[in-house]
């Protein structure tokens, strides 16, 4: 039986658009994520 293809196909533009700072800030839930990461002291807030 053949295995499926690898599901992670890296693409920086897609990564930024899905998980980037501006995308996060555009929704209330996204802002909550950034706030939680700031509170925790994460070096990286978003992708």
Curated annotation (Swiss-Prot):
Superkingdom, taxonomy of origin: Bacteria
InterPro entries named among the record's database cross-references: Ribosomal_bL34, Ribosomal_bL34_CS
Keyword entries, A-Z: Ribonucleoprotein, Ribosomal protein
Signal peptide span: none
Chain intervals with Basic residues compositional bias: 1-22
Annotated stretches, region: Disordered: 1-28
GO cellular component: ribonucleoprotein complex; ribosome
GO biological process per UniProt: translation
Gene Ontology MF terms: structural constituent of ribosome
Record family assignment: Belongs to the bacterial ribosomal protein bL34 family.
Protein name, per record: Large ribosomal subunit protein bL34
Species of the source: Corynebacterium aurimucosum (strain ATCC 700975 / DSM 44827 / CIP 107346 / CN-1)
Lineage, broadest ranks: Bacteria, Bacillati, Actinomycetota, Actinomycetes, Mycobacteriales
Gene coding for it: rpmH
């Amino acid at each position: 039986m053949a295995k499926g293809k690898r599901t992670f196909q890296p693409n920086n533009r897609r990564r930024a658009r899905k998980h980037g700072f501006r995308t996060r800030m555009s929704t209330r839930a996204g802002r909550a994520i950034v706030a939680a990461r700031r509170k925790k002291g994460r070096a990286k807030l978003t992708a």
